[in-house]
């Protein structure tokens, strides 16, 4: 393979260039994807039908190699590269401005790779996480340690120094690019930068892999989006460290932030692969939906990520960090789905979220939304369907799950919200006071005039809500919510175990667990749960038959309860809830499988 060096003044010409014709886009797509779980379900939820094939072997660049030295023109090299070429950027160098990825007629055997020229041996392995250590940064205040004993700067840095634009901009029609070993950021300042890697909602873009990148804003500046997926298909965000995405305004120029976001616009969207990343954002760490759309993103794989918000972003905390004006960043949740279908959330750690702005400190929101913009409801086709959440740990939150079908602020009706499977999840350190919310495990509800919530299963969950186990809402004139299953869980009930979301016409207004379940759900299954420390005024007769009522957490016989904060929630061999599930397994999460799934997630 022949290599070329581009001096600072060199312009790469198109002389002799040949284009690779794409005979069939369907064939090209098939070469980067596989039928992953086609026809497979987790409980009621269909699993993704297609996964992005993002291994290095699946994204070959067999063409020429070009090197852009420090001070060279990266854009010239990219503009003139042929499909299949590799462009090397100088390790440790800074390239200022915007890198635009232009449309080229590439195919699945001829990717354009843009990467640091540091050798592979100087980078994390192809399935290992990038951290700031590889940019010479040994630690970041308020973040988990990334075990950097020998920091080294082997990344090439792309830094945007303006306003209202982006460090990496993906053009309409761009396809078959892989970025490796880059730091992508902005300069500090009071100006808003709306995205670091940006794809417009109106642009048809496909086959992109963002691999082992450090994508970040600055500690105090408003930076809205890390990776904005726009109108894209077959995109992977892998092995990357994304941090300092935040906005300070409840209304105004920068109101919401995400590490990764998409799900709006009229173009086909998905599949997406978001795997083995550190994802930090004040708003939603991941968001799908929230704007005008006439199509739904499909086949979304979210695995092995660490969702995180530094507690230093909470006003009044030691070492508080806010915006350039001193105000706190707007905090919302870890994952919010307003428009998404066939989503797998598997083997993730989700830490730190709180209320105090427009939300109540829930970790996960499954809330289809026909969003209202300028008085118009702009997404009647928005749905959240077929979502699986499993083998994950949620900690330091005001609530676990908000699951609801509701009208938008302008009265917009979503298409559907249904078929959710949640199992083998630990939710601990739920604290409504500290994290400014309700202190509950889950809220389930259907608003007026919207499609009813149905087919929700919550099984083998270990959780310690201090206030309320379930909040339920549905007006009596609505049809009952269908097919609710709550089994094999180990959960503290709190003093208000199954409670009404409010209103005298709510099906849950009795606040008596058995009556609420009978009145709100048809049919329902609520059995073989360990309902820990249920209050004396809610005797066993006020619950469905077939459940267990340990008087306190000690009676459960956890290996180490530790106050419900970071404990070892294995059951001791003598626990009465060992092998007590409907399936012969222990009540609560399968801790062995969960720990194995989370191995290597940091």
Give names to the regions the model predicted:
Residues 1-16:
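N-terminal secretory signal peptides that target proteins for export/translocation
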Residues 22-33:
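Bacterial N-terminal signal peptides
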Residues 111, 175-186, 204-217, 233-248, ...:
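Right-handed parallel beta-helix
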Residues 109-112, 155-169, 190-201, 219-230, ...:
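Extracellular beta-strand/beta-solenoid scaffold signature
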Residues 103-108, 518-520:
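Short, conserved loop/helix-junction motifs that constitute active-site signature segments
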Residues 55-96, 100, 164-167, 575, ...:
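Acidic Gly/Asp/Thr-rich repetitive segments characteristic of extracellular carbohydrate-active
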């Amino acid at each position: 393979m022949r290599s070329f060096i581009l001096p600072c003044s060199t312009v790469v010409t198109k002389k002799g260039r040949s284009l690779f014709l794409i005979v069939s886009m369907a064939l090209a797509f098939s070469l980067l994807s596989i039928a992953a779980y086609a026809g497979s379900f987790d409980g009621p939820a269909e699993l993704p039908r297609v996964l992005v094939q993002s291994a290095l072997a699946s994204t070959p660049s067999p063409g020429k190699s070009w090197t852009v030295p420090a001070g060279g023109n990266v854009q010239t090299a990219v503009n003139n590269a042929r499909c299949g070429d590799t462009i090397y950027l100088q390790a440790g160098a800074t390239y200022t401005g915007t890198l635009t990825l232009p449309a080229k007629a590439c195919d699945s055997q001829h990717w354009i790779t843009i990467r640091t020229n540091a050798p592979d041996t100087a980078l994390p392995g192809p399935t290992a996480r990038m951290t700031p250590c590889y940019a010479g940064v040994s630690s970041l205040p308020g973040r988990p340690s990334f075990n950097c004993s020998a920091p080294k700067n082997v990344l090439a840095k792309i830094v945007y120094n303006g306003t209202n634009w982006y460090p990496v901009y993906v053009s309409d029609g761009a396809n078959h690019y892989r970025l490796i070993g880059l730091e992508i950021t902005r300069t500090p300042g009071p100006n808003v930068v709306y995205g670091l890697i940006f794809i417009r909602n109106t642009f048809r873009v496909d086959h992109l892999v963002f691999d082992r990148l450090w994508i970040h804003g600055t500690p105090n500046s408003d930076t809205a989006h890390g990776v904005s997926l726009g109108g894209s298909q077959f995109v992977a965000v892998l092995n990357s460290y994304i941090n300092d995405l935040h906005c300070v305004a409840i209304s105004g120029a920068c109101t919401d932030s995400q590490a990764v976001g998409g799900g709006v616009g009229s173009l086909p969207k998905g599949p997406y692969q978001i795997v083995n990343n550190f994802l930090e954002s004040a708003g939603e760490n991941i968001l799908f939906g929230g704007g005008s759309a006439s199509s739904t993103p499909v086949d979304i794989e979210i695995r092995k990520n660490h969702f995180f918000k530094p507690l230093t972003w909470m006003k009044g905390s030691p070492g508080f960090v806010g915006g350039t004006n001193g105000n706190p960043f707007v905090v919302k949740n870890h994952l919010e789905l307003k428009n998404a279908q066939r989503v797998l959330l598997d083997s993730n750690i989700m830490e730190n979220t709180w209320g105090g702005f427009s939300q109540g400190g829930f970790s996960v929101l499954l809330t289809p939304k026909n969003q209202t913009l300028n008085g118009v409801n702009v997404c009647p086709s928005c749905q959240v369907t077929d979502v699986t959440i499993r083998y994950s740990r949620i900690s330091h939150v005001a609530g676990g799950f908000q699951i609801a079908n509701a009208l938008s602020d302008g009265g917009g009706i979503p298409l559907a919200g249904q078929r959710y499977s949640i199992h083998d999840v630990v939710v601990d350190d739920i604290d409504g006071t500290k994290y400014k919310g309700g202190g509950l495990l889950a809220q389930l509800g259907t608003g007026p005039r919207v499609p009813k919530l149905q087919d929700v299963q919550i099984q083998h969950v270990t959780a310690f809500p201090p206030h309320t186990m379930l909040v339920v809402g549905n007006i009596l004139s609505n049809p009952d919510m269908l097919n609710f299953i709550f089994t094999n869980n180990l959960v503290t009930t709190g003093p208000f175990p199954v409670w009404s979301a409010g209103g005298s016409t709510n099906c849950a207004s009795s606040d008596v667990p058995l009556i609420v379940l009978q009145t709100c759900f048809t049919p329902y299954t609520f059995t073989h749960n360990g309902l820990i420390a249920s209050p004396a005024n809610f005797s066993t007769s006020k619950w469905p038959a077939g459940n267990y009522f340990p008087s306190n957490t000690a009676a459960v016989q956890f290996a180490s309860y530790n106050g419900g904060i970071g404990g070892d929630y294995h059951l001791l061999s003598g626990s009465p809830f060992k092998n007590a599930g409907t399936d012969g397994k222990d009540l609560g999460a399968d801790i062995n499988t969960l720990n194995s799934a989370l191995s290597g997630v940091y």
